[in-house]
UniProtKB/Swiss-Prot annotation:
SUPFAM superfamilies documented for this protein: PP2C-like (SSF81606)
Subunit description: Interacts with UBE2I/UBC9.
A GO MF label: protein serine/threonine phosphatase activity
Cross-referenced InterPro entries: PP2C, PPM-type-like_dom_sf, PPM-type_phosphatase-like_dom
Record-linked Gene3D superfamilies: PPM-type phosphatase domain (3.60.40.10)
Protein's recorded name: Protein phosphatase 1J
Classification via PROSITE patterns: PPM_2
Biased composition regions of type Polar residues, renumbered to the chain: 59-73
EC number of the protein: 3.1.3.16
Keywords in alphabetical order: Hydrolase, Phosphoprotein, Protein phosphatase
Length: 507
């Protein structure tokens, strides 16, 4: 039975046209060489980005003008297969002995024709953070020493829309922004004492005080709010998202940073997982059969009150075209003066109000489920980019309603003894649109039970099975699931991270 499950997964992946010719490039590129800077910004679609598999030169056979994650190690032929909407071959890193950190599993597949290329991007890195105080007064870095810093593990999924530029840029630079934000915290995070209230104005100067010698909590006011090390890391991640979004705004014209992207990022640092989500990608932990949600979707429905409050406070953002109020359906002119159900930014329930002329405007939030939209345009309310997004046939900008700040949840790995079958699953909405949490947990149990606990390929096989299960198989009426419902026609990207980590006997 176990062998049949393995062979079935292998057959499905190979029949989809998975690349068999991959380049022999070594392990992941190191992400610690330089901070975010102008020279690291996205290049045009015809140039090769530094942290992506880039487009080959034009040949008589074909021209490929898109990129996939470096760790896939795709050859030019593999890039063409990955870009094939008809075959929709599942792509995973090659089994060459150099695996992703923590034996992480990864799989992806292109959409069924929704966009020209796969607009998802992914990143998996081990990043070293050196304290700013380890630099001399002249700014020259001393010899790196792990006594001066620490490493964090990093995974990121970026689901692009209206083009792949924002997702590609975020996949190459967001972890660098996070590293920059953590540089101020190296000594503080190593110190068991509570964080200081203030930092010195010029870190790294001779004679600068240690973290415990900085401004005393009692020297300013009392009592002081309790600030934990966790909250400092969360703040660093939040600021990094904001700085990444600002960089996209500055450089969107010169570097063709088109569209926007949802971002789902995981950091492993000092024994804890930090899961940051801005968009409609999701993460869950499957632990001993238990499902632990580690994120939530940010859509016009889930953030209705935040959007309505902004529209209420700044009506100029709505122009004369939209109303911040929500009605069960579009108000008709013949209903002027009647009392109709509505709700505003302060309400979770419904009430009646007299319909006025302003209520005839289009609602700021409309639709339900996957069809919910902000200003009749976009179905996500958090993410990076979208600085040029405007309402159709209008000059109204939608960006003010879109937040770049993620929600960050923390999971302490030291509080539970994890077994080889305990995993963190990250997926773009292409997975979750057709697969619920229970189905993912069932797939985790089915696939992992067919492999030995110390087999590192089991997590890649699981990622492939999740992608295949969401994609379905081609039939006369499109891609179909076993129950004959439509499979996902979107790009699908999945990370499977074993929670045992690098120190476990099976990683």
């Amino acid at each position: 039975m176990l062998n049949r499950v393995r062979s079935a997964v292998a057959h499905l992946v190979s029949s989809g046209g998975t690349s068999s010719q991959r380049s022999k490039s070594p392990d992941l590129p190191n992400a610690t060489s330089a901070p975010p800077a102008a020279q690291e910004t996205p290049k045009s679609s015809r140039e090769k980005p530094g942290n992506q598999v880039g487009a080959p030169q034009k040949t008589a056979e074909t021209t490929v003008s898109f990129s996939r994650p470096t760790f896939l190690q795709l050859s030019p032929g593999g890039l063409r297969r990955a870009d094939d909407h008809a075959g929709r071959a599942v792509q995973s890193p090659p089994d060459t002995g150099r695996r992703l950190p923590w034996s992480t599993g990864y799989a992806e597949v292109i959409n069924a024709g929704k966009s020209r290329h796969n607009e998802d991007q992914a990143c998996c890195e081990v990043v070293y953070v050196e304290s700013r105080r380890s630099r001399s007064v002249t700014g020259v870095s001393r010899e790196p020493s792990h006594n001066q810093g620490f490493c964090f593990y990093y995974w990121g999924l970026f689901d692009g829309h209206a083009g792949g530029g924002a997702a590609e840029m975020a996949s190459r630079l967001l972890h660098r922004h996070i590293r920059e934000q953590l540089k101020d915290l190296v000594e503080i995070l190593k110190d068991p004492l509570p964080p200081p209230l203030c930092l010195p104005s010029t870190p790294g100067t001779p004679g600068a005080p240690s973290p415990s010698q900085l401004v005393s909590p009692q020297s300013c006011w009392s009592p002081q709010k309790e600030v934990t090390h966790d909250s400092l890391i969360v703040g660093a991640i939040e600021n990094a998202f904001h700085l990444m979004d600002e960089q996209m705004a500055r450089e969107r014209r010169g570097h063709q940073v088109e569209g926007g992207c949802c971002a789902l990022v995981v950091l492993y640092l000092l024994g804890k997982m930090y899961v940051a989500n801005a968009g409609d990608s999701r993460a869950i932990i499957v632990r001993n059969g238990e499902i632990i949600p580690m994120s939530r979707e940010f859509t016009p429905e889930t953030e209705r009150q935040r959007l309505q409050l902004l529209g209420f406070l700044k009506p100029e953002l709505l122009g004369s075209e939209f109303t911040h109020l929500e009605f069960p359906r579009r108000v008709q002119p013949k209903e002027l003066g009647q009392r109709m159900l509505y709700r505003d930014q302060n309400m979770t329930g419904w009430a009646y109000k007299k319909i006025e002329v302003e209520d005839l405007r289009f609602p700021l939030v409309c639709g339900e489920g996957k069809k919910a939209r902000v200003m009749a345009t976009i179905g996500v309310t958090r993410g990076l980019g979208d600085h040029n997004l405007k309402v159709c046939s209008s000059t109204l900008s939608i960006k003010p309603f879109l937040s770049c700040f993620p929600e960050v949840r923390v999971y302490d790995l030291t509080q539970y003894e994890h077994c080889p079958d305990d995993v963190l699953v990250l997926g773009t909405d292409g997975l979750w649109d057709v697969t619920n949490d229970s189905e993912v947990a069932a797939t985790v149990d089915r696939v992992l039970s067919s492999y030995e606990p110390n087999d590192p390929s089991r997590y890649t096989a699981l990622a492939q099975a999740l992608v295949l299960g969401a994609r379905g198989i081609p039939r006369d009426r499109g891609w179909r699931l076993p129950n004959n419902k439509l499979g996902s026609g979107d790009d699908i990207s999945v990370f499977v991270i074993p929670l045992g980590g690098p120190g476990s006997s099976y990683s």
